Amino acid sequence: MNKKIAIIDYDMGNLLSVKKAFDYIGANSFITSDSKEIEKSDAIILPGVGAFPDAMSSLKENGIDKTIINEAKNGKPFAGICLGMQLLFDESEEVTNTKGLGLIGGKIRKMKTEFKIPHMGWNSLNIPRECNILKGVSKGSYVYFVHSYYAELADKNNLNAYCDYGTKLPAVVSYKNIFGIQFHPEKSGEIGLTILKNFWELI
């Protein structure tokens, strides 16, 4: 079977670096903004950098939001990266209160820490709850972050990994077939590639 991952293009992400990472591990992926192509895929990646309200507006413009909600709820492996993870939640307070995709319960809030914001650079993972995409990833593994907002979870059972930055910041979350990755796996060396390979192997 010719498995393929749809990387969603909605003008809010560094798509090529994500695709290159999948190419490197031998995973078949393609970049698209077409709902029909997304529906034909075997798994979905929602990358993203930028502001939450702009991202939701862009997803809604051509109905991609409804497509990915339906595909995720129907059990297709789905992962959001960085801003893409934050979009999975119910709403965000970034700029103005904006509703998200509502696939994982919780709200995106402005980071409160005595450390510099944005949280940018390498930080280590604590892993309180294993999940499929963290297979082979050890506690203390370093990954690369760039963000100023964090996920406040409605259900702590959705938390798989976090980092310490003056406060606990969720780094990996999941609910059934849906995963959120706050850091950039495509910029996180072998650990990041392991996580992307684990996602590919869910198909």
Swiss-Prot record:
Stored Pfam families: GATase
BP term (GO), one: L-histidine biosynthetic process
Catalytic site positions: 82, 184, 186
Location relative to the cell: Cytoplasm
Pathway: Amino-acid biosynthesis; L-histidine biosynthesis; L-histidine from 5-phospho-alpha-D-ribose 1-diphosphate: step 5/9
InterPro entries the record matches: Class_I_gatase-like, GATASE, Imidazole-glycPsynth_HisH
Domain of life (superkingdom): Bacteria
Assigned keywords, A-Z: Amino-acid biosynthesis, Cytoplasm, Glutamine amidotransferase, Histidine biosynthesis, Hydrolase, Lyase
Function as written in the Swiss-Prot or TrEMBL entry: IGPS catalyzes the conversion of PRFAR and glutamine to IGP, AICAR and glutamate. The HisH subunit catalyzes the hydrolysis of glutamine to glutamate and ammonia as part of the synthesis of IGP and AICAR. The resulting ammonia molecule is channeled to the active site of HisF.
Protein name according to UniProt: Imidazole glycerol phosphate synthase subunit HisH
Chain's gene name: hisH
